[in-house]
Amino acid sequence: MTHELISLPYAVDALAPVISKETVEFHHGKHLKTYVDNLNKLIIGTEFENADLNTIVQKSEGGIFNNAGQTLNHNLYFTQFRPGKGGAPKGKLGEAIDKQFGSFEKFKEEFNTAGTTLFGSGWVWLASDANGKLSIEKEPNAGNPVRKGLNPLLGFDVWEHAYYLTYQNRRADHLKDLWSIVDWDIVESRY
């Protein structure tokens, strides 16, 4: 199976100023493209040659895992945003967040803290288990909650390439601003 670079569901400048056009061009067009290209090269002749991304991320190690993890992570990341979205989740996901975290604001605070305190590069995820129980997962480097049998719902990239062109070392500010472009309909559909 050949893995493809996903198409963005919006124009490259649509998420500005939260995610600048230049950041999207580098992040999607160069970083993600490289992960996809490397993954396709690395899986040739392996047990993963015809596997889907989730399976590869769950079962692989080393370079295959790193490139598959980053491909899966970025596919989820780029498709969860839309210009003019934001707000709070509704429906079952909104209810579960309120129940488990006390309120949406408390959830955001805990999520942002997880993202700002993750040392080095990685991801912070809202994930659910098979019973719908939510958790905030800090994943270093290319990690994804699927490795723990969890379903990733919402992921914020805390690798510096995700924010440095606009925010420099202000990771916390970037995380706070991302909430204004989250498409909760997409995130809810993953729950």
Swiss-Prot record:
Cofactor remark: Binds 1 Mn(2+) or Fe(3+) ion per subunit.
Class of enzymatic activity (EC top level): oxidoreductase
GO molecular function: metal ion binding; superoxide dismutase activity
Binding site for Mn(2+): H27, H74, D157, H161
InterPro entries linked to this entry: Mn/Fe_SOD, Mn/Fe_SOD_BS, Mn/Fe_SOD_C, Mn/Fe_SOD_N, Mn/Fe_SOD_N_sf, SOD_C_sf
Gene3D superfamilies: Fe,Mn superoxide dismutase (SOD) domain, Iron/manganese superoxide dismutase, C-terminal domain
Catalytic activity: 2 superoxide + 2 H(+) = H2O2 + O2
Pfam families, per the entry: Sod_Fe_C (PF02777), Sod_Fe_N (PF00081)
Alphabetical keyword list: Iron, Manganese, Metal-binding, Oxidoreductase
Regulation: Inhibited by hydrogen peroxide.
Cofactor(s), by name: Mn(2+); Fe(3+)
Residues where Fe(3+) binds: H27, H74, D157, H161
Alphabetized SUPFAM superfamilies for the sequence: Fe,Mn superoxide dismutase (SOD), C-terminal domain, Fe,Mn superoxide dismutase (SOD), N-terminal domain
EC numbers: 1.15.1.1
Protein family per UniProt: Belongs to the iron/manganese superoxide dismutase family.
Subunit structure: Homodimer.
The protein's role, per its UniProt record: Destroys superoxide anion radicals which are normally produced within the cells and which are toxic to biological systems. Catalyzes the dismutation of superoxide anion radicals into O2 and H2O2 by successive reduction and oxidation of the transition metal ion at the active site.
Entry protein name: Superoxide dismutase [Mn/Fe]
Organism per entry: Porphyromonas gingivalis (strain ATCC BAA-308 / W83)
